[in-house]
Amino acid sequence: MKRPILSLLAGLALTLAALPASAACPRIVSQSPYITLALEWMGLADCVVGVSRFDRREDLPRTGGVIDPDADTIAILDPQLMITSRWTAAAKWQAMAPAGTTTLRVDGFKGTADMEQALREIGRAAGVADIDARVDRFAADWRAAAAKVNGGRRRAVVMTACSGAPYSFGRGTTLYELFAHAGLDVVADHDGIRNFRPDGPPDELPKWLDSIKPEVIFALKNSRDEACNASLVRADTMIVPLDGDRFTHPGPRVLLGLEQLREALNP
């Protein structure tokens, strides 16, 4: 089954290769949706020739996931620049790069400064001449958007708890810092992300919430019809569902998330 697909990709690659090359538009493989969104924000949507299986760009060939990139497809696409997240092993990413291809691994999830740095690194690798000015404007914009939220220092936790295993965003994560900048007292008492595994103690999440006593739980959802985890429900806590797609892609999309947060807290 894979051979016909590879043949089609080979034909597509030949067609694309026949187009005039542009120094301002390198052929890019983006191995994570948040990287694709960053490239689009930089005006490089047409430079992307391959994306991961999780990307919303249905018009482009799929190049596997961050853990298991598809080396065969990437080779056929013959990119000039391959960008992935830190979840892809560095040696694996470098080994599957065609000769002469630049590889890059970025983060963006380890705080707001890290989010901005990831954008700078992507832009510099892609040859965006004004990337520093762009990121400086974005930094000012998200801070202004956060200031408008007026969180009132409410005790809060930020979780994805509406599908699968819940997890909380703690100190040192981009979401923790964004919500703190929005005037909320984020009371997660852990660093990084804390997972509440389905095979763990059944009362682990309720006990944790009882211990930190949040006034509001921001539950990031992937779709409008998801039902949030029943363990979140408590008499003295407000649950505010938010569109996870606006928050979990570090970069300019968080401006939409901060606007939704402002509207949710100031109806």
What is each model feature region?
Residues 44, 98-101, 182, 233-237:
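Short, structured coil segments at secondary-structure junctions
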Residues 36-41, 57-59, 164-170, 226-228, ...:
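Short, solvent-exposed loop/turn elements at domain surfaces
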Residues 26-87, 91, 184-187, 197-201, ...:
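A short, structured surface patch at a secondary-structure boundary
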Residues 198, 221-232:
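Exported/periplasmic ABC-transporter solute-binding proteins
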Residues 23-27, 81, 91-167, 188-190, ...:
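Extracytoplasmic substrate-binding proteins
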Residues 32, 86-87, 108, 160-162, ...:
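Short secondary-structure boundary segments
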Residues 2-40, 59-60, 71, 76, ...:
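Bacterial Sec-exported substrate-binding components of ABC uptake systems
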